[in-house]
Amino acid sequence: MSAFNIFALVVVVCALMINECCTSQEPTTPLKAASQCSNVKCRRRFDHLGNSVTEGCPSGCLCVYQATGYNQEANGTCYELMKTSTTTTTEGTPAQ
């Protein structure tokens, strides 16, 4: 084997080792474990008119589907929506 072939083989082996070592699917969890949305499963289905209906998430939660398409039934997980507060002035317009 020539030096170039050995070098190429070493590069490929290193790349495969790095790929195996550094690519893993980490489980996602809600930020607050005690929220109303944690560990709640939701589902997207279609009613008799073909409209998408989401079931299972409490108010203030967002259902994130585990599906690639938007036109299929899917299961998902509920996540808490971020809450923000706005301050208004006496004129009724939001303060900057």
Curated annotation (Swiss-Prot):
One of its GO terms (cellular component) is extracellular region. Transmembrane segments: none annotated. Keywords: Complement system impairing toxin, Disulfide bond, Secreted, Signal, Toxin. The keyword Signal applies. Its main location: secreted. Complement inhibitor. Prevents complement-mediated C5 activation by binding to C5. Binds C5 at a different binding site than the other tick complement inhibitors OmCI and CirpT1, and the drug eculizumab. Inhibits complement in human and guinea pig but not in other species tested (rabbit, rat, mouse, and pig). Belongs to the RaCI family. This is Complement inhibitor RaCI4.
